[in-house]
């Protein structure tokens, strides 16, 4: 089954370097017509709530960290990892095995290809893939330049 509302992985450090857990007192909000797959984990917020909006579909074995917001009608596919405080816009497709670093903002109508690593914000209507989340159109142009010298 899925695990909904677990404490996020938030730590600070004592002066001697000992890690201490930061309490998570937020909750999660799940909209209407949401599907959440097996072995998925959605962490509750640290102070504010983690939010999954209406019509979101989350596949099996997805991890969504504390304070995230997943916009309406977005799809999150197997093994995707969304780090803390990420905001995903509406109508997005987050591909399998993709990872999004904390505090990134993903615009509306964004497609993130499988295995992508996203380390910065993405504007609306982009198709992104690759190790550093390259815009798909830019990647195709670069490939053509390399192959054909154009």
Feature roles, as predicted:
Residues 2-135:
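Structural signal for interior beta-strand "rungs" in well-ordered beta-sheet cores
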């Amino acid at each position: 089954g899925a695990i909904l509302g677990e404490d996020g992985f938030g730590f600070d450090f004592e002066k001697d370097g000992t890690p201490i857990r930061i309490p998570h007192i937020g909750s999660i909000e799940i909209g209407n017509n949401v599907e959440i797959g097996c072995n998925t984990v959605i962490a509750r917020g640290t102070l504010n709530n983690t939010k999954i909006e209406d019509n979101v579909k989350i596949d099996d074995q997805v991890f969504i960290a504390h304070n995230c917001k997943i916009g309406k009608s977005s799809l999150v596919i197997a093994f995707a990892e969304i780090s803390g405080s990420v905001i995903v816009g509406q109508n997005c497709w987050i591909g399998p095995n993709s990872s999004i670093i904390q505090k990134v903002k993903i615009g509306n109508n964004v497609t993130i290809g499988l295995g992508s690593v996203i380390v910065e914000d993405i504007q609306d209507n982009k198709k992104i893939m690759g190790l550093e989340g390259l815009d798909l159109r830019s990647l195709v142009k670069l490939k053509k330049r390399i192959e054909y010298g154009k």
